[in-house]
UniProtKB/Swiss-Prot annotation:
Biased segments, Basic and acidic residues type: 325-345
UniProt keyword terms in alphabetical order: Nucleus, Phosphoprotein, Repeat, Ribosome biogenesis, Signal transduction inhibitor, WD repeat
Name of protein: p21-activated protein kinase-interacting protein 1
Originating organism: Homo sapiens
Source species, domain of life: Eukaryota
Nucleus keyword on record: yes
Described function: Negatively regulates the PAK1 kinase. PAK1 is a member of the PAK kinase family, which has been shown to play a positive role in the regulation of signaling pathways involving MAPK8 and RELA. PAK1 exists as an inactive homodimer, which is activated by binding of small GTPases such as CDC42 to an N-terminal regulatory domain. PAK1IP1 also binds to the N-terminus of PAK1, and inhibits the specific activation of PAK1 by CDC42. May be involved in ribosomal large subunit assembly.
An example Gene Ontology biological process: ribosomal large subunit biogenesis
Basic residues bias: start-end ranges: 381-392
Length: 392
């Protein structure tokens, strides 16, 4: 397990997490160890996303950088947007979706790292996007005062809803039965079946990050030191606790056996990990913390076990964000992908090709040996028949 965080200082931090198996309860303590610091971009980092293999970062320098966490190397960079990258979301291990200030939403093949489709999503900037747990839908908000629903199977707009103000965050619930739209310090809760607001929660300060801890409990952080847990059904605050000395910039939550963890990053430079209680009315206990001495902007958690990152759908049922026809139409455009290690990538490609050829050759050689064996057997039978005739 590894925490990754970006900052204004253009650096990507990586911290290895070491849980203490013997400790338990409120006295449980985990350890964070600095693993790497990488000068990732030429401007401040604005977004980060993780899957089971890669970490991707977006920046004000308009590029998306890819890092292979297994090999601990930079894998390359994606260049397509002409504005700050505002949001990055993986769906499984096959697709990455990016949004930026240029109003575009791009769907990327996370294997070949090609742009499958580029959609002019908003008249203004794309400020945030969220993918439905099924992978079939996505929501986006922008500076054109619209909330847009996207059909990812067909790669087209499904529904446009005008809202009174510019929203800056949108988030699906774990089961995808509801979603929240954030405008400044206001949280509007929408039901999927009616597409209407079922309730509104007001936070004290402008909201910077929200995370669903369950289908009805929402963690909210903003331009203050406090994190609050709200019940989306009753619209009441279940609990609040002081998490940092400065405003909280981002949060991330995940579950591993016997632990439900929320991670917070703040402008004070600290990253903290908290163990959630079953009763969300009780504040979580601090597992560990580390000071980066940087102004943090975005946060992610890379779980090194594939089992920890399994999607709710099996691979066979996992829907593709773009149809086959559109993937043919949306071929890789020149300049979409810029690999820093082009010379290295070519031999790798050849190596993959050679590996494929060698498997094919092995299969063919197996077929040839079978034919030879049959021919030998036939010749042997003919020879025996001739021998019998000669004896007669």
């Amino acid at each position: 397990m590894e925490l990754v965080a970006g900052c204004y200082e253009q650096v990507l931090f990586g911290f290895a997490v070491h849980p203490e198996p013997e400790a338990c309860g409120d006295h449980e303590q985990w350890t964070l160890v600095a693993d790497f610091t990488h000068h990732a971009h030429t401007a401040s980092l604005s977004a980060v996303a993780v899957n089971s293999r890669f970490v991707v970062t977006g920046s004000k320098d308009e590029t998306i950088h890819i890092y292979d966490m297994k090999k601990k190397i930079e894998h390359g960079a994606l260049v397509h947007h002409s504005g700050t990258i505002t949001c990055l979301k993986f769906y499984g291990n096959r697709h990455l979706i990016s949004g930026a200030e240029d109003g575009l939403i791009c769907i990327w093949d996370a294997k070949k790292w090609e742009c499958l489709k580029s959609i002019k999503a908003h008249k203004g900037q794309v400020t945030f996007l969220s993918i439905h747990p099924s992978g079939k839908l996505a929501l986006s908000v922008g500076t054109d005062k619209t909330l847009r629903t996207w059909n990812l199977v067909e790669g087209r707009s499904a529904f446009i809803k005008n809202i009174k103000q510019n929203a800056h965050i949108v988030e699906w619930s774990p089961r995808g039965e509801q979603y929240v739209v954030i405008i400044q310090n206001k949280i509007d809760i929408y039901q999927l079946d009616t597409a209407s607001i079922s309730g509104t929660i007001t936070n004290e300060k402008r909201i910077s990050s929200v995370k669903f801890l369950s289908e009805s409990v929402l963690a909210v952080a903003g331009d203050e030191e406090v994190i609050r847990f709200f019940d989306c059904d009753s619209l009441v605050c279940l609990c609040e606790f002081k998490a940092h000395e400065n405003r909280v910039k981002d949060m991330f939550s995940f579950e591993i056996p016997e632990h439900h963890v929320i991670v917070s990053a703040s402008s004070d430079g600290f990253i903290k990990m908290w163990k959630l209680k079953q009763d969300k009315k009780v504040p979580p206990s601090l597992l560990c913390e580390i000071n980066t001495n940087a102004r943090l902007t975005c946060l992610g958690v890379w779980l090194d076990k594939v089992a920890d990152m399994k999607e709710s759908l099996p691979p066979a049922a996992e829907p593709s964000p773009v149809s086959k026809e559109q993937s043919k139409i949306g071929k890789k455009e020149p300049g979409d992908t810029v690999h820093k290690e082009e010379k290295r990538s070519k031999p790798n490609t050849k190596k993959r090709g050679l590996t494929g050829d060698s498997k094919k050759a092995t299969k063919e050689s197996g077929l040839i040996s079978t034919k030879k064996r049959k021919m030998v057997e036939m010749l042997e039978k003919k020879r025996k028949k001739k021998k019998i005739k000669t004896m007669q």
